[in-house]
């Protein structure tokens, strides 16, 4: 295993740890939102029901002024909290024409909207940090230290919120999933009332869909979008000095045929396209990639030329502290041409270091 392969594995492990913490935060929020919705449904049964059943025709009466005001206040609170999503709220004039069932259905939509807004914020923050990690892992492997980049908007915009899949970014997919789930929940709600379901039965059915779908949709996005950000951010530092790559799937019993077969192909870095020849290839994909160099001697000569032409000139590249000096001594060049003055590498030494870190000595 090369140094770079090992670092990619460490990045995956770090991402998985962050994902686990993110999932816990989302689960806590989802549970709290359903608890609030549950209380609203219970209040409907208490106010409009008899013997634990609500007559459907009673739900077709106009929404009360009090409930209408509460719904509008909730919409206003949401727009203030998430101004970037305010345009997704229903037109206020339509609220005045709602019946009781529609009022409760709007509450379901608002619950899902709150979940979508929170999920967006949490996933974006996770991806921002992951993009910084990915860039720094790549820069470290090229000899520029472990914390070359700090988080800033210019960096984040390259990777986070990019519409790489079907012309949509992760935020759009969250809202699409939200609207779809709200429609299903509202259909369940209306059909449950029409059947004369008891409060317990209605809430039980809603909870099953609510909990299962919200979590599944969010987890799929976290996993897949994380793979995109990891792959793209780690690739960025390599674009200047390398031209080819191949994909690197986790080869186990869960590896799909797409990822397993794709690993045999070599692609141009400039022609990479997520979902086509670069990770992720599908939902839940966690492929990575590795650099391909056909002729390392030729690459080293080109590296020296691009970085001033003097192989013995001082380089800005630094050796990772855990790599021993003897690991980067070239087999076919004089050690004096590669050696170090304190921690300073020559240009040739930098090239040999990068070759070693990428596993070139193993080929």
Residue ranges and their predicted role:
Residues 1-121, 125, 208-212, 216-363:
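Activation/maturation switch segments at domain boundaries
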């Amino acid at each position: 295993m090369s140094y770079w392969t090992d670092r990619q594995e460490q990045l995956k492990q770090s991402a998985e740890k962050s994902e686990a913490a993110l999932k816990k935060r989302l689960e806590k929020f989802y549970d709290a939102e359903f608890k609030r919705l549950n209380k609203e449904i219970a209040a409907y049964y208490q106010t409009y029901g008899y013997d634990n059943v609500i007559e459907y025709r009673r739900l077709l009466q106009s929404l009360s002024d009090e409930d209408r005001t509460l719904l509008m206040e909730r919409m206003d609170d949401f727009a203030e909290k998430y101004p970037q999503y305010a345009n997704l709220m229903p037109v206020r004039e339509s609220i005045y024409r709602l019946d009781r069932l529609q009022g409760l259905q709007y509450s379901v939509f608002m619950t899902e909207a709150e979940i979508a807004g929170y999920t967006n914020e949490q996933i974006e923050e996770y991806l921002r940090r992951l993009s910084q990690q990915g860039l720094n892992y790549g820069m470290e492997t090229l000899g520029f230290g472990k914390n070359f980049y700090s988080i800033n908007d210019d960096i984040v915009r390259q990777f986070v919120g990019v519409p790489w899949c079907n012309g949509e970014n992760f935020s759009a997919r969250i809202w699409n999933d939200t609207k779809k789930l709200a429609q299903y929940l509202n259909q369940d709600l209306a059909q449950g009332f029409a059947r004369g379901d008891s409060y317990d039965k209605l809430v039980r059915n809603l909870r099953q869909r609510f909990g299962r779908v919200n979590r599944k949709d969010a987890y799929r996005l976290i996993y897949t979008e994380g793979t995109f950000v990891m792959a793209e951010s780690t690739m960025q530092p390599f674009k200047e000095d390398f031209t080819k790559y191949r994909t690197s799937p986790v080869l186990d019993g869960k590896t799909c045929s797409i990822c397993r077969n794709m690993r045999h192909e070599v692609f141009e870095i400039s022609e990479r396209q997520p979902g086509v020849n670069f990770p992720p290839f599908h939902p839940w994909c966690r492929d990575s990639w590795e650099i391909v160099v056909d002729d390392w001697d030729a690459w080293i000569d080109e590296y020296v030329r691009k970085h001033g032409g003097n192989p013995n000139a001082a380089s800005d590249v630094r050796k990772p502290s855990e790599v021993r000096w003897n690991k980067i001594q070239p087999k076919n060049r004089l050690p004096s041409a590669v050696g170090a003055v304190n921690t300073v590498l020559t240009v040739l030494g930098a090239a040999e270091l990068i070759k070693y870190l990428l596993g070139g000595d193993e080929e």
